[in-house]
Amino acid sequence: MNDTTATRCGYVAIVGRPNVGKSTLLNHILGQKLAITSRKPQTTRHNMLGIKTEGTVQAIYVDTPGMHKNGEKALNRYMNKTASAALKDVDVVIFVVDRTRWTDEDQMVLERVQYVQGPVILAINKTDRIEDKSDLMPHLEWLQGQLPNASIVPISAQHGHNLEALESLIASHLPENDHFFPEDQITDRSSRFLAAELVREKIMRQLGAELPYQITVEIEEFKQQGRTLHIHALILVERDGQKKIIIGDKGDRIKRIGSDARRDMEVLFDSKVMLNLWVKVKGGWSDDERALRSLGYGDL
């Protein structure tokens, strides 16, 4: 991000279909892991702010759930509504797309981005994997035709390729404003929220094809005692079969989930962590609007 003489601050929405690299991009820009990632679609469920202050420029990134077509359940409707809402009242929109692949869900996002009045940046992800860059041209020309006023920046969210150019362009679009957050603040989310997300990430990474998407995590206790942070997390599933999958044979899987989550928590919170996990069946929670609100999913 380039330094400027003017003090600038604004909101930047990162949007795109599921699993296109939005959270990976945010983590790389921030220089640390904040948003959870996995190879599974719909990993991100909530909007989350990632705040980067560099010199006179403060960019407030809004990491959003991927917009998707399978929106029958209340949870899916919440995620789509949350992602769409992020396009309103922001100063810049980054639309992340794959270098070659275009899906119905990309089209769904495009149709919403076309109504955005402010600056739009098309971030073409994974371009570092293409040897002959001329292969990109037909796709880029088509995208430019769909969003004629958008800037196009080829990037690699995973490896950080060309992110300096992306951040410089973002900074140029931010309005002159005093900073909204302290210089050392990196997110608006609580430590309890981040802990729950880390547990959910490890579940998604451990389970692979067995993954039950009807899972969520609640933090029941988050308490610093001396040099140790004690965290009790409740994993909610919808069926007994899902509970058995998460626990695994003789509890081996839930032990791995806990061990992996604890390591990341100790880095994030800079503290020794004692993590306890429980699994509970709560049938139909992902399609129960009242249950979703009680679990922190907001208005539907």
From Swiss-Prot:
<protein>
    <recommendedName>
        <fullName>GTPase Era</fullName>
    </recommendedName>
</protein>
<keyword id="KW-0342">GTP-binding</keyword>
<comment type="subunit">
    <text>Monomer.</text>
</comment>
<keyword id="KW-1003">Cell membrane</keyword>
<dbReference type="GO" id="GO:0003924">
    <property type="term" value="F:GTPase activity"/>
</dbReference>
<dbReference type="GO" id="GO:0043024">
    <property type="term" value="F:ribosomal small subunit binding"/>
</dbReference>
<keyword id="KW-0547">Nucleotide-binding</keyword>
<keyword id="KW-0997">Cell inner membrane</keyword>
<dbReference type="InterPro" id="IPR009019">
    <property type="entry name" value="KH_sf_prok-type"/>
</dbReference>
<feature type="domain" description="Era-type G">
    <location>
        <begin position="8"/>
        <end position="176"/>
    </location>
</feature>
<keyword id="KW-0690">Ribosome biogenesis</keyword>
<comment type="similarity">
    <text>Belongs to the TRAFAC class TrmE-Era-EngA-EngB-Septin-like GTPase superfamily. Era GTPase family.</text>
</comment>
<dbReference type="InterPro" id="IPR005662">
    <property type="entry name" value="GTPase_Era-like"/>
</dbReference>
<dbReference type="GO" id="GO:0070181">
    <property type="term" value="F:small ribosomal subunit rRNA binding"/>
</dbReference>
<keyword id="KW-0694">RNA-binding</keyword>
<feature type="region of interest" description="G4">
    <location>
        <begin position="125"/>
        <end position="128"/>
    </location>
</feature>
<feature type="region of interest" description="G5">
    <location>
        <begin position="155"/>
        <end position="157"/>
    </location>
</feature>
<dbReference type="GO" id="GO:0000028">
    <property type="term" value="P:ribosomal small subunit assembly"/>
</dbReference>
<dbReference type="InterPro" id="IPR006073">
    <property type="entry name" value="GTP-bd"/>
</dbReference>
<dbReference type="GO" id="GO:0005829">
    <property type="term" value="C:cytosol"/>
</dbReference>
<feature type="domain" description="KH type-2">
    <location>
        <begin position="199"/>
        <end position="283"/>
    </location>
</feature>
<dbReference type="Pfam" id="PF01926">
    <property type="entry name" value="MMR_HSR1"/>
</dbReference>
<comment type="function">
    <text>An essential GTPase that binds both GDP and GTP, with rapid nucleotide exchange. Plays a role in 16S rRNA processing and 30S ribosomal subunit biogenesis and possibly also in cell cycle regulation and energy metabolism.</text>
</comment>
<dbReference type="GO" id="GO:0005886">
    <property type="term" value="C:plasma membrane"/>
</dbReference>
<feature type="region of interest" description="G1">
    <location>
        <begin position="16"/>
        <end position="23"/>
    </location>
</feature>
<keyword id="KW-0963">Cytoplasm</keyword>
<feature type="region of interest" description="G3">
    <location>
        <begin position="63"/>
        <end position="66"/>
    </location>
</feature>
<dbReference type="InterPro" id="IPR030388">
    <property type="entry name" value="G_ERA_dom"/>
</dbReference>
<dbReference type="InterPro" id="IPR027417">
    <property type="entry name" value="P-loop_NTPase"/>
</dbReference>
<keyword id="KW-0472">Membrane</keyword>
<dbReference type="InterPro" id="IPR004044">
    <property type="entry name" value="KH_dom_type_2"/>
</dbReference>
<feature type="region of interest" description="G2">
    <location>
        <begin position="42"/>
        <end position="46"/>
    </location>
</feature>
<dbReference type="Pfam" id="PF07650">
    <property type="entry name" value="KH_2"/>
</dbReference>
<feature type="binding site">
    <location>
        <begin position="125"/>
        <end position="128"/>
    </location>
    <ligand>
        <name>GTP</name>
    </ligand>
</feature>
<dbReference type="InterPro" id="IPR015946">
    <property type="entry name" value="KH_dom-like_a/b"/>
</dbReference>
<dbReference type="InterPro" id="IPR005225">
    <property type="entry name" value="Small_GTP-bd"/>
</dbReference>
<feature type="binding site">
    <location>
        <begin position="63"/>
        <end position="67"/>
    </location>
    <ligand>
        <name>GTP</name>
    </ligand>
</feature>
<keyword id="KW-0699">rRNA-binding</keyword>
<feature type="binding site">
    <location>
        <begin position="16"/>
        <end position="23"/>
    </location>
    <ligand>
        <name>GTP</name>
    </ligand>
</feature>
<dbReference type="GO" id="GO:0005525">
    <property type="term" value="F:GTP binding"/>
</dbReference>
